[in-house]
Amino acid sequence: MTKPAADASAVLTAEDTLVLASTATPVEMELIMGWLGQQRARHPDSKFDILKLPPRNAPPAALTALVEQLEPGFASSPQSGEDRSIVPVRVIWLPPADRSRAGKVAALLPGRDPYHPSQRQQRRILRTDPRRARVVAGESAKVSELRQQWRDTTVAEHKRDFAQFVSRRALLALARAEYRILGPQYKSPRLVKPEMLASARFRAGLDRIPGATVEDAGKMLDELSTGWSQVSVDLVSVLGRLASRGFDPEFDYDEYQVAAMRAALEAHPAVLLFSHRSYIDGVVVPVAMQDNRLPPVHMFGGINLSFGLMGPLMRRSGMIFIRRNIGNDPLYKYVLKEYVGYVVEKRFNLSWSIEGTRSRTGKMLPPKLGLMSYVADAYLDGRSDDILLQGVSICFDQLHEITEYAAYARGAEKTPEGLRWLYNFIKAQGERNFGKIYVRFPEAVSMRQYLGAPHGELTQDPAAKRLALQKMSFEVAWRILQATPVTATGLVSALLLTTRGTALTLDQLHHTLQDSLDYLERKQSPVSTSALRLRSREGVRAAADALSNGHPVTRVDSGREPVWYIAPDDEHAAAFYRSSVIHAFLETSIVELALAHAKHAEGDRVAAFWAQAMRLRDLLKFDFYFADSTAFRANIAQEMAWHQDWEDHLGVGGNEIDAMLYAKRPLMSDAMLRVFFEAYEIVADVLRDAPPDIGPEELTELALGLGRQFVAQGRVRSSEPVSTLLFATARQVAVDQELIAPAADLAERRVAFRRELRNILRDFDYVEQIARNQFVAREFKARQGRDRI
């Protein structure tokens, strides 16, 4: 028989060693015996015994031989028996080096798994490609060390339980040796259920839950466990490319960020928290880790996605399905919490959406703290000296899901997930080219930095702990936003939405977009390659054409030159792209509105400017992420630095403020923020004669009806603010202003709030007029240039 390759670690050095051979076929045992013969030849004075490792689900009788080998009296003396080394050994089978995507898919078929070939296939491999067979040895441990670990961590006392413990430790050591050869992408937690159920810590917590049983906890662990397999890992990239086949095949990464993250992941376990705009995100993160040969992530997902054949496949590739509503199930909450802690303790990486669900508006949602609190508990309990919260920014040039999101905004119901839904989703990915997928990894946030050392004060102060969690989560989200590149899709959509259906020529699009690009360059904001191409007319044409045919831009070619516009029915879809870039223009938009407010303010206009900037920040806090108050003021001051002696000019007021705004490039508030205040104003108008404690569903229905009336009357600029998604945050604003609760002066305060919003909308009108004057001046200058040619 041709000799197989042997791993460098598969060397025995101890004088007395028990080799535990994990084998599935006689061929594998032959290979291990051949390897053991080599070890004996190298160390003739050492004693090597070999025992076949019982399978995981073997009956108790199968452990008898191992029980005897572990007995202190089995060796020449009890002491020498305890000093005996245990070394697990197995044969791993590598897949063919030139395997295609089709080959990876075919591995799902019975008898085609390259990692677990049949005995007949094994003999053929040894004849034709013996390098695919590797004898590997796991890390050794003394019997005394294993016995002490067993006593310290489990509730078991019987010698047969100790043998089971040693078996599990052997299999775990082999798994570590295996992924060192196969690659970090194959690293996964093994034997989670038996390890946790045998844990003294887990059983003690279980005893404190009324009515809880080990059997019920075991069923929940079965539901959570991933059942990881190498074939499924290989399929992650195949399925990921299938689900994203409408995009460029190569994801766009920042190589410096990838290198920094790789170094960080070598030091600490991490939770990868990704922005969530599409179901595709669920495959982007695993594929990104594989692309860059980084350790895999164990993705949390709603159990609603565990359907058909996809459920088992996703589970075996690292997906952890969790129930949606667990508030009234203390046992499930406990099992989930302990499962998260166990995975973190074993230094595996977790991942989920920091927003908890897809953002259907294009902007980031507030972070959800549910799973984060479990990770924090694991850290504070000392299961790791630090845990990194690694933000992941995922953005797209285009998404086919915006049609669905636009329907949601108009009040449609969510389509339930299922096989038909999955088929339609994957089918839609191949209908056209959607551009690139951009993946960014900003600097990770240290849990230790925000929560202090393990076992610290926060363990005894739930309120302080929750506040620290909120600050930590917002910091992760803030870093995600700062790393998210601005796309051409977002800039073009934002510009065309401001025209309210009026078409623009290529030259008009090009010269108007340059101010935004100049601003992003000054601020050193990250931009996509598609946005960089907007510097040229060809790049603008490519971006506008990519959005044409109702995706969501309409192109008209019947005249002297093509023109582009957004039809009313496509405004909600275009708004998704526009909202994805607001973060880059948020503070400069607030500056414009604060200047407009100061123009008609009485008294100290500088003070009025600052007061209004802070007020706008407060009103918008449910829709957008902001820096803390001190940093926000510093950012606003930096935004004003473009105008020399701005406070002096602001204090004069009148035409000076007009001149300041006219000189500002770009003017973005109308494009970026008007729609949100229009939605707030619609809700405020509904509240004028609504019951004090009106419910969210009734408020939304009334706002939709009134909003449609306002669109018909021209009282709002477009149909975009008439959105269930925007009304949801508008209601949060109203609750924050204490306008949805009985009070003696409620009616007066509701009227005052609507008046305040109308005054803000008046400021939008003022800034918009100046922006139009800028556009006319640019257009006049451009025409003069064309006339000279």
Curated annotation (Swiss-Prot):
Cross-referenced Pfam families: Acyltransferase (PF01553), GPAT_C (PF19277)
Recorded GO CC terms: plasma membrane
Domain of life: Bacteria
Major subcellular site: membrane
Alphabetic keyword roster: Acyltransferase, Cell membrane, Lipid biosynthesis, Lipid metabolism, Membrane, Phospholipid biosynthesis, Phospholipid metabolism, Transferase
Entry EC no(s): 2.3.1.15
Catalytic activity: sn-glycerol 3-phosphate + an acyl-CoA = a 1-acyl-sn-glycero-3-phosphate + CoA
Family, as annotated: Belongs to the GPAT/DAPAT family.
PANTHER family: DIHYDROXYACETONE PHOSPHATE ACYLTRANSFERASE, GLYCEROL-3-PHOSPHATE ACYLTRANSFERASE
Description of its domains: The HXXXXD motif is essential for acyltransferase activity and may constitute the binding site for the phosphate moiety of the glycerol-3-phosphate.
Name the UniProt record assigns to this protein: Glycerol-3-phosphate acyltransferase
